Amino acid sequence: MDMGRVILGASTVSAVVLAVGLGVAITPGGGLTTDVQGGGICGTFPDDSTPVSTWFMTSFRNDTGHGIRVRDVRPAELHRVTLTHLSIATDPDASSPGLVVTDDADRPAEYGRTVPVDSGYVVPAHGELDVVGRLVLRDDADAGRLHGVVVTTVGPLGTLQSVTDPGSFGIGIGTGHAESDIGCDGA
């Protein structure tokens, strides 16, 4: 009888230790973060301009001491714009602007080389993830915006973690646009 209790007690202790160990292994230990609290940046073209487009870049920081694999990057919301390009900039210039208002379809040179968002890119320990994209204003709109960029990463044991940059990137024609239309004040 005493031997049975010893075996049962040892089994219980082992199960608890394994459960705690598994919980520690799959609990997120930090990841990507962003300093953006909201708001946005935008630009406008003169009245009667066509086509109207903009390039944008936003950054996420890896606060951990290990690399983090990116699984996916996507817009949270699109309002009257089309996202024609989205990629990861592997080494942008330090002076790269967050928004380049241009009708040029070519990516700005300051953004440097890019890789696809689903390439399995690994954000180095204490490094940055820079996401670049191109927005084109729809023909039937005078202002539009992207609100939020969502990055999904792969954590321990294949767990998925997502972080959202809540900022807006907007583009418009003319002036006097509501913030809800273009994503920033005063445009």
Over which residues does each language-model region extend?
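Non-catalytic macromolecular-recognition regions in eukaryotic signaling proteins
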Residues: D2-A187
